[in-house]
Curated annotation (Swiss-Prot):
This is Crossover junction endodeoxyribonuclease RuvC. Belongs to the RuvC family. Gene3D superfamilies: Ribonuclease H-like superfamily/Ribonuclease H. Its cofactor is Mg(2+). The lineage of its organism: Bacteria, Bacillati, Bacillota, Clostridia, Moorellales. It is found in: Cytoplasm.
Amino acid sequence: MLILGIDPGTAIVGYGLVEARAGQTRALVYDCIRTPAGEDPCRRLATIYAGIRELIERLQPETMAVEELFFNKNSKTALAVGQARGVILLAAAHTGLPVAEYTPLEVKQAVAGFGRAPKEQVQRMVQALLGLEEKPRPDDVADALAVAVCHASFAPWRQREKEVAGR
């Protein structure tokens, strides 16, 4: 299964394409979409949307895994990230790409074995699990790969739940 992991943001959207086959996962492509600071917020969202659409069309993932919004103390930041998530989900919907969403706690649990693992531990585990020579940078890229690895772990269970519920 080809999974496009996404870490939403307004300045940087991390992404990583992970292949999960026969219990093995490997990173195929990872990078980020950047939007210029100070640019009109609507232009930034348009840049994110266009970038995600281009990735979906070029990489042909089978599914997208997106980190859910974690509300912090800065509501302005949370709102902006929520808008970025919206255009990311819209790009997936326009291309018919299925989307799975995971909380930061679920991602950390799947990757590091502990839902409250520090960011550094999650990054080291992403590096180890995907056999990367270096930790992916910036952090947003490592987070996107972590979301994809999380989905690779959860996808079989989610499919089984659907099958059981459909009976």
